């Protein structure tokens, strides 16, 4: 709750990511194997409360309370999630490279992973002004953890099983703008 904007007097919040809304559409559903993979994208406003003080390099449009974000979501067979993970983060890298922006992909160590995440990486763009890379997106494989929490399963002759979910930030407007202007 410390990172989210709650609407007073309501049990409503402004979203920090569209991932929850998109995957939530499938809550408590049993899908057919033929429906997979389900690939979705969303362009939405995102709202974040930032906690704590940040350094001078995070002033301006780097860390803002409202921004636009393009996201990719995949619901897939468990055996396909690793391939989707690789494909998804590469889409973001290819987008930035097509704009002649130097980027790199960094795998997050397990100690830095948020709840439910099995694997995650950050996509970072080069900042000539700061002479260092900064985060412009991230990609995560939650394996079946999110599907278990939401009750999203796949129908099978051998019994129903949980699918895998993945998400990827393709473009966060303000950080992409910084990378574009500086490069």
PLM feature spans:
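TRNA-recognition modules of translation machinery and tRNA-sensing kinases, especially anticodon-binding
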Residues: 1-183
């Amino acid at each position: 709750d410390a990172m989210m904007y709650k609407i007073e007097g309501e049990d409503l919040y402004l979203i920090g990511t569209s991932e929850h809304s998109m995957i939530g559409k499938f809550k408590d559903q049993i899908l057919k194997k033929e429906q997979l993979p389900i690939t979705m994208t969303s362009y939405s406003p995102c709202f974040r409360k930032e906690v704590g003080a940040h350094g001078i390099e995070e002033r301006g449009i780097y860390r803002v309370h409202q921004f636009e974000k393009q996201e990719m979501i995949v619901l897939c067979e468990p055996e396909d999630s690793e391939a989707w993970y690789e494909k998804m983060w590469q889409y973001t890298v290819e987008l930035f490279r097509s704009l002649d922006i130097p980027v790199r992909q960094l795998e997050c160590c397990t100690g830095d992973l948020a709840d439910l995440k099995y694997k995650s990486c950050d996509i970072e763009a080069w900042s000539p002004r700061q002479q260092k890379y900064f985060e412009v997106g991230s990609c995560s494989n939650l394996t079946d953890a999110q599907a278990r929490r939401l009750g999203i399963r796949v129908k099978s002759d051998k019994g129903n099983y949980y699918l895998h979910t993945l998400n990827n930030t393709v473009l966060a407007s303000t950080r992409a703008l910084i990378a574009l202007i500086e490069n």
